[in-house]
A protein has these predicted regions:
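Bacterial Sec-dependent N-terminal signal peptides
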Residues: 1-27
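Soluble metallo-hydrolase cores and metallopeptidase-like ectodomains found primarily
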Residues: 28-30, 104-105, 111-146, 211-290, ...
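Metal-dependent peptidase/peptidase-like ectodomains
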Residues: 110-112, 125, 220-225, 230-231, ...
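Extracellular/luminal Protease-associated
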Residues: 112-221
Length: 460
């Protein structure tokens, strides 16, 4: 054997030895992380406290303020190296008195409808009533003549597509009816718009969510009705048995007000290089914000607690951020991004959990090809824990603005099973009782493990 071949052979042997050693060390560390989460985990009780002691946490509300203090106390309880509040400004919208809605049939009979105002909508200023004009798709409304719509209440009955395996794809296709429905209906002279709730089950829960107005387009009330009521109304409309729709909403917008993001850290050897993880502390005012996004909050809180408990010494500063105002403005995410840039920090990676507390399936990664190649190698370590999705593209609403300030940053998104998420999303049914303890704990363990590997290998 030549000296060159001998050196190459020895080099391969040494590389293989170290790779095997690293794999063994990492495999053991992941097992310790999962054991801590499943045996001594705090995530479920922390979620119980957030949901039951505080409840829904809409930006600008007293409950949102309580949640900020809750988050600060929780981080201090787990002895993070530093805990602090970052000032932001948030919009303030209130639902007011409970909404009411009815349909009147051609025979004069009234039937109650389960309805909720969309976030940001104006109120009806008393009882609003009118003839219904139905469209099965937002595009159909856009193509309608003004004479078909003017003076009427528009009903957009566009269902999420049950054929989609990933329910977020079905949601994404329908999101514009909620976000833009009021603008498109108002352009044609409608007096209000109601939409079919964005959810796959046929049930009685209306789902709220953000909507917007455009300058120069008259503002009209916007609301969602339950999928069960949408099915009923569609049948009545087709049979021409629906006389009119009546609704009353008391919601109002108020001036912006001060609020905070909550931040906790474990300092690394390279203290000015940051890897962050987080979710949004605010929620809509229906339900308890358990899956959206209480689960993401306690996932990341628990992940940092686990690494601290296991006495892991990070290379980079590991940071947890509880973002405020993701649901109706994203001022927490936007303010955080500009703030860390102004501090001169090197923000190298961020991970977000905002898809509920269901069984972990994997992660998405939005970064350079060189990082993605290392990222997919992590799959082997996660095989014992049944994670199998390692896809290109990732992140979330809260961490998205970091890309504007740090073009080379890598964003990660936690991907749990999606099949049940839109059963509860933005609805009264998004409560603590609908979160499974073990699934939640497995999610926290997966995130802690991913952050450990990011710190030790992906950005070493």
């Amino acid at each position: 054997m030549s000296n060159h071949k001998r050196c190459l052979f020895v080099s391969i042997l040494i590389s293989g030895f170290f790779l095997t050693q690293f794999y063994a060390q990492d495999s053991l560390m992941l097992r310790r992380i999962y054991t801590e989460a499943l045996v001594n985990g705090k995530s479920y009780e922390d979620l119980r406290s957030l949901c039951k002691d505080i409840g829904p946490r809409l930006s600008g509300s007293s409950e949102a303020e309580m949640a900020i203090r809750w988050g600060e106390r929780a981080m201090k309880k787990y002895n993070f190296d530093t805990v602090y509040l970052q000032p932001i400004e948030v919009p303030h919208w209130e639902r007011g008195n409970p909404e009411s809605a009815w349909i009147e049939l051609k025979n004069g009979k009234l039937e109650k409808v389960n309805l909720c105002a969309l976030g940001g909508s104006i109120g009806t200023e008393g009882l609003l009533e009118g003839e219904i004009v139905m469209f099965n798709h937002l595009d159909s409304l856009k193509k309608a003549k003004r004479s078909e719509v003017e003076g009427k209440i528009v009903f957009i009955n566009q269902p999420m597509n049950p054929a989609e395996i990933t329910t977020f794809k079905a949601y994404g296709a329908c999101y514009p009816i909620r976000g833009n429905g009021a603008v498109e209906a108002s352009k044609l002279g409608a007096k209000a718009v109601i939409i079919r709730s964005l959810g796959l089950p046929i049930d009685e829960f209306p789902h709220t969510g953000s909507m917007h107005y455009e300058e120069g387009i008259p503002k009209i009330p916007a609301a969602a009705i339950s999928t069960l009521d949408a099915e009923k109304m569609a049948e009545l409309a087709k049979a021409k048995y629906l006389k009119k729709f009546m609704m009353e909403m008391d919601c109002r917008n108020f001036p912006n007000q001060p609020s905070f993001n909550v931040i906790g850290e474990i300092k690394g050897k390279k203290s000015n290089e940051v890897i962050s993880m987080g979710g949004h502390l605010d929620s809509w005012d229906q339900g308890e914000g358990a899956h959206d996004d209480g689960a993401g909050i306690v996932h990341c809180l628990e992940a940092l607690r686990i690494l601290k408990t296991l006495k892991y010494k990070p290379q980079h500063t590991l940071r947890v951020v509880f973002f405020m105002n993701e649901e109706n403005g994203n001022m927490g995410g936007k303010t955080y991004a500009t703030w860390v840039k102004s501090k001169g920090e090197k923000h190298i990676a961020a991970l977000e959990s905002d898809r509920g507390g269901f069984t972990p399936r994997g992660f998405g990664c939005d970064g350079k090809d060189s990082v993605f190649k290392e990222f997919v190698k992590c799959e082997e370590l996660f095989k014992p824990y049944d994670l199998h999705i390692w896809e290109k593209g990732g992140g979330g609403v809260d961490i998205g603005p970091l890309k504007n300030e740090f073009p080379d940053i890598t964003l990660f998104g936690f991907i749990p099973d999606s099949q049940r998420y839109f059963d509860f999303h933005h609805a009264d049914s998004d409560v603590f009782e609908n979160v499974n303890k073990r699934e939640l704990e497995l999610g926290a363990a997966a995130i802690a493990s991913m952050v450990y590997l990011m710190d030790k290998h992906l950005f070493h």
